[in-house]
């Protein structure tokens, strides 16, 4: 997959010209430019690991369950699946969240074949897909979302998004008036 480093060069958008071919790298570049713009807005409001909903930590002896929810990581609010982890229950243990990325082809997902029945590309392969999922681990490399001490929840890291703080300030000012 080809992608030029447009962000470093301060390129803002791509201009398609009549009579010229679009390159596959240019489709990837368009997506990257848009994702970077969205991420810059998201990063000004949220921190990686901010829980939007759910993602509660439930401890039952040496098993930790993190409920399904939504969490901001790497520029996107992501759906998370319920996850069960085994802990030692001794000392300090961190529950971390990270993104696991895989490339999906039409071999793994037949719905990626062209569905335009009757066309020359009918049931032909098209673009691969990049799949990103949130993976929880004990003492992993990701963002710390909870800290356990001797098997008990010591700190569930839920920092309020900047918009929540702004809303609270506005509510106090409105109430005071």
Residue ranges and their predicted role:
Residues 1-16, 21, 26, 60-177:
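Beta-strand-rich solenoidal segments
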Residues 9, 14-53:
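N-terminal "first-domain core" detector
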């Amino acid at each position: 997959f080809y992608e030029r480093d447009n962000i470093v060069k301060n390129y803002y958008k791509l201009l398609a010209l009549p009579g010229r071919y679009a390159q596959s790298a240019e489709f990837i570049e368009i997506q990257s430019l848009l994702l970077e713009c969205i991420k810059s807005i998201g990063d000004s409001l949220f921190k990686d690991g901010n829980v939007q909903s759910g993602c509660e930590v439930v401890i039952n002896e040496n098993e930790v369950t993190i409920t399904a929810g939504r969490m901001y990581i790497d520029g996107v609010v992501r759906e998370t699946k319920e996850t069960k982890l085994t802990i030692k229950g001794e000392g300090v243990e961190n529950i971390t969240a990270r993104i696991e990325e895989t490339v999906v082809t039409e071999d793994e997902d037949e719905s990626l074949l062209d569905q335009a029945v009757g066309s020359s590309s009918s049931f032909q392969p098209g673009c691969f897909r990049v799949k990103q999922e949130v993976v929880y681990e004990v003492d992993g490399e990701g963002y710390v979302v909870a800290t356990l001490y001797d098997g008990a929840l010591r700190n569930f890291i839920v920092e309020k998004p900047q918009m929540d703080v702004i809303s609270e300030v506005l509510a106090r000012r409105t109430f005071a008036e």
